[in-house]
Amino acid sequence: MDAVLAAARSGDTAALRSLLDPDAVLRADPGAARRGVRPAHGAPAVARALAARAATARPALVDGAPGLLAAPSAIYVFTAPAGPITSVDVLADPSHLSHRTIAVPA
């Protein structure tokens, strides 16, 4: 997540694209959609979305896996089964957050 955050904070979409699968997707639950997060498909679109929205997030463990915590109450859950990130789920709906274990490293 350090590389994702560094690239997002600097607005380096090329660096973000290098971390993403070419067919990566970004999905938004209803709570995130109400906050203006829109779905994206393809590394360039997902990179732009992350650069625009994840720059102020901080690293977190979401259900034990690397993710991001964004204020006020949203999480980014990444799927990278064997290499590049294939999907990003942005969750902000309280019903989707209530059953998640979120830990912010010190």
Predicted regions, residues:
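C-terminal and inter-domain tail/linker signature
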Residues: M1-A106
